[in-house]
């Protein structure tokens, strides 16, 4: 039997998913050529995957399996998408460049690798990759703040 807290969790997650998908659809429809809109679509979809992957019944069934690795990878890489989104919002001359895709792909691969090696006993390499994964959100949050600060006077 579902508890009131479980039902509230499902309600809030469902609402958030609906809003994220609506935002992605509206940005795609209304601003098909704007880099900030594309970055907004990407982060909205990435966050939708993260919300779905964090649902308790999905975590119970998929955690530790290879099927869960892309969800973890996307969740880790969302920090990079946040940085790209901020860059696109504040920099009028923003264009998506290869280093943006490289940063996103690297963060995703790091998250996937750590998910797939979750059952492995602690090794120096695993400790290093887990430390790097924990640093990803902090590093890209700082980069987002720097990007906003660099361009805020122009706006």
Model-flagged regions — what are they?
Residues 1-155:
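N-terminal low-complexity or simple alpha-helical regulatory segments
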């Amino acid at each position: 039997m579902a508890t009131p807290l479980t039902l509230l969790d499902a309600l809030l997650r469902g609402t958030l998913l609906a809003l994220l998908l609506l935002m992605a659809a509206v940005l795609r429809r209304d601003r098909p050529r704007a880099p900030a809109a594309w970055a907004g679509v990407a982060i909205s979809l990435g966050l939708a995957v993260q919300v779905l992957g964090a649902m308790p019944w999905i975590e119970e069934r998929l955690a530790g399996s290879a099927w869960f690795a892309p969800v973890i990878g996307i969740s880790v890489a969302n920090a990079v998408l946040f940085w790209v989104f901020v860059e696109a919002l504040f920099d009028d001359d923003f264009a998506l460049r290869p280093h943006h895709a490289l940063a996103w792909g690297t963060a995703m691969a790091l998250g996937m690798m750590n998910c797939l090696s979750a059952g492995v006993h602690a090794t120096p390499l695993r400790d290093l990759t887990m430390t790097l994964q924990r640093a990803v959100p902090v590093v890209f949050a700082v980069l987002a703040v720097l990007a906003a600060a660099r361009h805020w006077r122009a706006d």
